[in-house]
Swiss-Prot record:
Organism lineage string: Bacteria, Bacillati, Bacillota, Clostridia, Eubacteriales
Keyword Ubl conjugation among record annotations: no
EC number: 5.1.1.1
Record protein name field: Alanine racemase 1
Function of the molecule: Catalyzes the interconversion of L-alanine and D-alanine. May also act on other amino acids.
Superkingdom of source: Bacteria
Endpoints of the signal sequence: none
Gene: alr1
Pfam name, any one: Ala_racemase_C
NCBIfam families linked to this entry: alr
Record-level GO cellular component terms: cytosol
Coiled-coil ranges from the UniProt annotation: none
Length: 386
């Protein structure tokens, strides 16, 4: 238990981040690697994770929104940072001030960026988004879109730094749709080349493609979930890339009580003691990202043993049954998500229980939970968001 933070924390292993990045660097055939650190590095803390990525093989970073990019710049990150999504024109001053590379998917938008850059007498670098099969932002791969991008290339104070797309099903065994997307991407790029449009980097290789599709490793690849030690699905060949999970969510036992047969635990009386039971309370709940959907289904690791989560998970607390566990004490450390010795209960396990993906599970861990950064087995930093 740490003295200056509440007894719920997420340990982030910086050595494992470095290891994963090095493994990805070896796997990727691209000269450049764009480390995706959107959503606060998938809940791991972008300001603290980004430097480790850059020290171990990443050349660039990608975020989803302008505030994420600004936070990185203010922390001292100087490498190219691109925004994968939309930025309102009302925030264009921040794009300019912090030298951010903006995604573009319409001529009108690019024209306004060009005008803003011209007024400031600077040059903006942009990335062209191409929708090859996701059905979200991006130019469609048509002759009309080729002409639109050609017009963008002629705008003043604008450099097309990159062109990119995103695979919809590259993490599935059947790669037919993925190859169809790749074909559209290559066609569009070749049409641009015919018009002598200079583009420095192409990037379409996401986590699954980095692992299984070397033909998608153009000038850059764009790893996301694999940076954080998880695979994009159970259908990818995990032998292609050895990864180490980075986050371990922990807490401490804060209360222990004996309950009699017939007594209930938590809201809704969903758990009834069928025997004399020893129940421990943990100070973690769904406001911390420990979703209520895990109620009565999850387990935790305590003193080398599993203990079931019983009753409904509350906003700030939950209960576990420790009746069959030896000598649990108030203050004992509990692993909610992660590994301890030979036991583990991971984001993959949680995702399977609640019917989602590991991405969502790790992104759910809220900023009410302090991040404790570990290097060489020692705490090197504690970040309290609130």
């Amino acid at each position: 238990m740490f003295r200056h933070i509440r007894p719920v924390w997420a340990e982030i292993d910086l050595d494992n981040i470095a290891y994963n990045m090095q493994q990805i660097r070896r796997c990727s055939k691209s000269d450049e690697i764009i480390g995706v650190v959107k959503a606060d590095a998938y809940g791991h803390g972008a300001v603290d994770v980004a430097p480790v990525l850059l020290e171990n093989g990443a050349n660039r970073l990608a975020v989803a929104v302008i505030s994420e990019a600004v936070e990185l710049r203010k922390s001292g990150i100087q490498c190219p940072i691109m925004i994968l999504g939309y930025t309102p024109l009302s925030l264009v001053d921040s794009i300019i001030k912090y030298s951010i590379e903006q995604t573009v998917f319409s001529y009108d938008y690019a024209e306004k960026l060009s005008e803003a850059a011209r007024q400031k007498n600077i040059t903006l670098r942009i990335h062209i988004a191409l929708d090859t099969g996701m059905g979200r932002i991006g130019f469609l791969p048509t002759e009309e879109s080729v002409w639109e991008v050609y017009k963008i290339s002629k705008l003043s104070n604008i450099i097309i730094e990159g062109i990119f797309s995103h695979f919809s099903t590259s993490d599935e065994t059947n790669k037919e749709y993925t190859y169809a997307q790749l074909k559209k991407f290559e066609w569009f790029y070749n049409e641009l080349r015919k018009k002598n449009i200079k583009i420095n980097i192409r990037h379409i290789g996401n986590s699954a493609a980095i692992m299984e599709l070397p033909e998608t490793h153009f000038e850059a690849t764009r790893p996301g979930i694999i940076l954080y030690g998880y695979y994009p699905s159970n259908e990818v060949d995990k032998n292609k890339l050895n990864l180490k999970p980075i986050m371990t969510l922990k807490t401490n036992v804060v209360h222990i009580k004996k309950m009699m047969p017939g007594e209930y635990v938590s809201y809704g009386r969903k758990f009834k003691c069928e025997r004399e039971s020893i129940i421990a309370t943990l100070p973690v709940g769904y406001a911390d990202g420990y979703t209520r959907m895990l109620s009565g289904k999850a387990k935790v690791i305590i003193n080398g043993n599993y203990a079931p989560v019983i009753g409904r998970i509350c906003m700030d607390q939950c209960m576990i049954d420790i009746t069959d566990l030896p000598s649990v004490q108030v203050g004992d450390e509990v692993v909610i998500m992660g590994e301890s010795d030979d036991k583990k209960f991971t984001a993959d396990d949680m995702a399977e229980i609640i019917g989602t993906i590991n991405y969502e599970v790790i992104c759910m861990i809220s900023k009410r939970v302090p991040r404790v950064y570990i290097k060489n087995g020692e705490v090197v930093k504690i970040r309290n968001y609130v």
